[in-house]
Amino acid sequence: MSDPKIRTPIVCVMGHVDHGKTSLLDRIRGSSVVASEAGAITQHIGATIVPIEAIRKMSGSMEKIPINIPGLLFIDTPGHHAFTTLRARGGALADMAILVVDISQGFQPQTIEALQILRNCKTPFVIAATKVDRIHGWRINKDESFLSSFGKQNERVKTDIETKTYEIVGKLSDLGFSADRYDRVSDFQRNLAIVPVSAHTGEGIADLLMIMIGLAQRYMGEELKLSAEGPGEGTVLEVKEERGLGTTLDVILYNGTLSVGDEIAMASQDDVVTTKVRSLLKPRPMKEILIEDRFERVKSVVAASGIKVSAPGLEKVIAGSPLFVTRGNMDELAARIRKEMQEIHVNLAEEGIVIKADTIGALEALCKELESKEIKVMRAQVGPVSRHDLIDTETIKNPTFRVLLSFNTPILPDAADMIKDPLYTQVKVFSGQVIYQLIDQYVAWRDEQKRIAEKAQFEHVMMPAKIRLLPDCVFRQSNPAVVGVRVLGGKLRADVDLVKTDGKKIGHLKTMQLRQESIKEADAGLEVAISIEGATVGRQLNVGDDLLVDLPERHVKVLEREMLKNLNISTQEVLAEFVAIRRKAEPFWGK
């Protein structure tokens, strides 16, 4: 019998996109939710209870070992690039974690970010080296332990597995973690265990679960005992309408006990809301709480559980809110909830884009990811996109910030009508259900807008250029002088004034020709014929002379302050030469 005072340990599964987190959980629970999620990536936290009986059944070697924990509750954190507060909350919520790494691809940026989260949260974890069945030449032994299956492989495959495992060991060492393959680890507190597995064939899954149970049992007994008693504490995963029940909450209870009739407090769109639990619906073991299924009604639940709560007045509860059972300490809990919700607020800038999302976790996910890409956010809110949101966004001065990102949240009809109007161009709206795709769309649009703006700026700003008069290419001496020149650097355009390298004015370059065709501009390296008004060859200029475009001071300021990084090296050098000539006479010219 499981000790009723010991709660189910919470396990979170983290890792790089497409490394097989959801597939691994699918294998463990025997269901398949991969295809139902947007972009085949899990966007909201789901929870699955895997009872100890199921784990014993999978791992024959555990049948005789006394186990006093009731099973494992898995949280499947979002599987895309945004390792965010939703994940950090997943990390903090979890007692243990499985970090999924594709054995062939090794560590990716998100893997390292997941490691940092687990380190920050001080969460013990195991590495699941997935997709061993993809190793060339691997012979499948369905549902066997890794060591049993490994023993049946040929030497080349064994060597390949060893090499790939030690590449992971090496990378972990670089990041400050001591690790080895699980069967070579004697002290699981000091060393990370790497368990090679295949979600597709089930190989190694039993070993992984055995290690997780062992870790929980050996190192977390006291912590798990203490958490099962007292008033319940949890996190609201989702606020949902259920037929026959009205508005319900999907909750992860991570501490204490929750019973029918308990008064509970949560954050709502207005402030803190309290209500009494009408009914508790517990998912049947081995089912994912986010998949529609029958629930069993229970009178009370003990942490850790994924539970559905039915109660009056839940309509405005915010997904991601903490949930507390009150015991006459309402003021204290309300203050705690308000503090926690304030901490959720993201870093907002004076100027930036506007974002809307369906849950706090999603909002944070979006904000954190935008922050990592140095995209500023001016306003971040939970809820649908309204006409008012668009009107507010219109006031943003920078056109590349006059943008609204809508993640997984509806656009209300009045706003949709505005967006559909082909004449409405004031605000650019991006909406989607996969965070990284949404951000990629915005970044692509923003970069294109910048490119268009830069092109327009280049066309309006006079560009630096340096030319040299070529021998045997004087076609006319004056009125206007027509000569052949080579462009030594920069970008030469027609209709500009020219000066010598000592700053002396020469005349006005009126037109240019290349192979007897009129052109507007010429890049470095080209040889062209130019007409110069106000100059006479043999008097003001001679063959072999170098000339520079005489740039107005206001154009130099724009070039140096706004466009310098977009100028090629030769253009930058010509600009520097011209500015140095002008500053000999006027030290602060162009500054």
Curated annotation (Swiss-Prot):
Gene Ontology MF terms in the entry: GTP binding; GTPase activity; translation initiation factor activity
Pfam families in alphabetical order: GTP_EFTU (PF00009), GTP_EFTU_D4 (PF14578), IF-2 (PF11987)
Residue numbers spanned by region G4: 130-133
Keywords: GTP-binding, Initiation factor, Nucleotide-binding, Protein biosynthesis
Region (G1): 15-22
Region of interest: G3: 76-79
Residues covered by the tr-type G domain: 6-220
Residues that coordinate or bind GTP: 15-22, 76-80, 130-133
UniProt xrefs under InterPro entries: EFTU-type, P-loop_NTPase, Small_GTP-bd, T_Tr_GTP-bd_dom, TF_aIF-2_arc, TIF_IF2, TIF_IF2_dom3, TIF_IF2_dom3_sf
Chain positions covered by the region annotation G2: 40-44
G5 as annotated region, ranges: 198-200
CDD domains on file: aeIF5B_II, IF2_aeIF5B_IV, IF2_eIF5B
Stated family: Belongs to the TRAFAC class translation factor GTPase superfamily. Classic translation factor GTPase family. IF-2 subfamily.
Protein name: Probable translation initiation factor IF-2
Originating organism: Methanoregula boonei (strain DSM 21154 / JCM 14090 / 6A8)
